Amino acid sequence: MSAGIVQLIAIGAQDEYIVGNPEISFFSSTFKRHANFSQSIEKQTIHGAVKNNSMSSVQFERSGDLLSYVYFTLDDTTKSLDIQRWDTIIDKVELYIGGSLVDSQDALFTEKIAIDTFAQNVSKSANGTHPGVSARSYFYPLRFFFCEGPQCALPLVALNYHNVEIRIHWATAASDYNVECFANYYYLDNEERGNIATRKHDLLITQVQKNIGSRTIVQDLTFNHPVKYLASSDTTTDGALTSPSNKIKLNINGLDVSNFRWGKPHYIDVMSYYHTNFVTSPDFFLYCFCLSTSSLQPTGTLNFSRLDSAKIMSETMPINDPIYAVNYNILRIENGMAGLLYAN
């Protein structure tokens, strides 16, 4: 009798919980047919000269039915260029739909925080092709909600009366390069296009809020909406929220969520270990109300709109760096127009 047969027949009562009434087999597979679609990356027109400390805009063309990821590249007209500090090119990017501000993300958030907290795979992590501030990169990806996956794509075909626009605030070295913007579009078959164009959409989206550092030992958190997590852009080892020799705590409505704890490891290593997916070298303050920072599916929030007060308290060192909050909101698209369901 072969060893394989011996293992196969060595079954007891406990095995009923594992292999009794099997529901799957590892030796067959099934698949689902998907709706027909295509996709295309198309260059966008940047309106306004790219100059240091100035602003330009991109109004997305209605080339396709859905708008997906958007990114910027650099070149000197003879070859493409890579750079480590994209925050010297781009200060922040704002998203407008129908002339109303929907989200704003600065380069500190994109390059230092989102690179870790948004990563759903290695390719989008600090070990991927855009590693954030840790290494050089040939492109700068925007991290607005519609850029994070096909299920989040923005249905342009349902926005007959509202344009989608980004406004780019350039940083101090933008004039040194030729900057180009590209967007990925999805194209749908007639039936699915008609369905998306005519029905009402309540899109679950993420937004980014920012509080400037207080430069004192108490940081008031003036945020709104259900917040997934808090994070700071400080990636040094001697900041108030990152130092292994300073203690911090969170206070909500006058009640301490915890006693004072060392910033490192409690709010750096531990939070990244349990609540992120692809962080190998955590280096910034992170406080999670969610189970997973990278999941669009809600896994826990704290509704800051319902709080009287929220503070981060430092034991000895002043908090000098910005604090960011990533929150959920609903973008309603109906009758060819879009608007946020909940305002600040």
PLM features: residue spans?
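Short, low-complexity Pro/Thr/Gly
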Residues: M1-N344
